[in-house]
A protein has these predicted regions:
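Conserved beta-loop-beta element that borders a ligand/cofactor-binding pocket
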Residues: 21-22, 59-84, 97-99, 108-115
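Active-site helix of classical SDR
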Residues: 40, 50, 54-57
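C-terminal substrate-binding subdomain of Rossmann-fold SDR/epimerase-dehydratase oxidoreductases
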Residues: 105-224
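Flexible, glycine-rich beta-alpha linker
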Residues: 25-27, 49-50, 74-98, 122-123
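Short, conserved SAM-binding segment of the class I
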Residues: 1-8, 138, 165
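Conserved Rossmann-fold NAD(P)-dependent oxidoreductase catalytic core, especially the SDR/UDP-sugar
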Residues: 3-48, 74
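Conserved catalytic Lys-bearing alpha helix of Rossmann-like short-chain dehydrogenase/reductases
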Residues: 1-5, 14, 54-62, 96
Length: 224
């Protein structure tokens, strides 16, 4: 799909195209925080490899069309996203919506504790979807160069601290139970956003404010 879209953007002389990538394009063992120049400097995370390769192909295709045909195609790499209309299915949701559902359900049912996988020590970065949209619009208006641009907040938080923040926002008074027998995953995943900052953009929605917004939208859901 992406190859057809990029090619047809060239054929129909689209003035500008923004390709949306993913932070999984970076090597599994890349230094933290992740800088744009770390692309293709090492092996990818095996579980994400096919998806990551497709995204990398899109980035390189945009750069090639820029080089060969002068197309104004740019690429951006967002960090972990959250916000309205997220997926709350505990079988396949991401960590933040899963925690929100767990704490809301526990509060409503009066459960004494909420269980979470692993030790809670891994760190992750979270960007509100509205901030991503604002960054993309800004870059469409101001950025006209090859290569990619990371979009994130430049700060991370441990999963346990995230759970405690969600607990506070939801108003759940029980306890949090970690399960060290379950896998923790990658220890840290943080985007270097110095390039984006130098271009004049910074995220506006704090993590606490963003989670509060989401909570207000979903707090009355009847999950059973």
């Amino acid at each position: 799909i992406q190859s057809n879209v990029i090619h047809q953007a060239y054929v129909h002389q689209v003035k500008k195209l923004l390709f949306l990538g993913s932070s999984c394009i970076y090597p599994k063992m890349a230094p933290q925080p992740l800088k744009e120049e770390y692309l293709l400097t090492g092996l990818l995370e095996p579980t994400n490899e096919p998806y990551a390769i497709a995204k990398i192909a899109g980035i390189k295709m945009c750069d090639a069309y820029r080089s060969q045909y002068g197309c104004n195609f740019i690429s951006v790499m967002p960090t972990n996203l959250y916000g309205p209309n997220d997926n709350y299915d505990l079988n396949n949701s991401h960590v933040l919506p899963a925690l929100l559902r767990k704490f809301i359900t526990a509060k409503n049912s009066g459960a004494p504790s909420v269980n979470m996988w692993g030790t809670g020590s891994p760190k992750r970065e979270f960007l509100h979807a509205d901030d991503l949209a604002a960054a993309c619009v800004y870059l469409m208006q101001t950025y006209d160069a090859e290569g990619l641009v990371n979009i994130g907040v430049g700060e991370d938080i441990s999963i346990l601290e995230l759970a405690q923040l969600v607990q506070k926002i939801v108003g759940y008074e029980g306890t949090i139970q970690t399960d060290p027998s379950k896998p923790d995953g990658t220890p840290r995943k943080l985007m270097d956003v110095s390039k984006l900052a130098a271009l004049g953009w910074k995220a506006q929605i704090s993590l606490e404010e963003g989670i509060q917004r989401v909570y207000e939208e979903i707090k009355d859901k009847d999950w059973r």
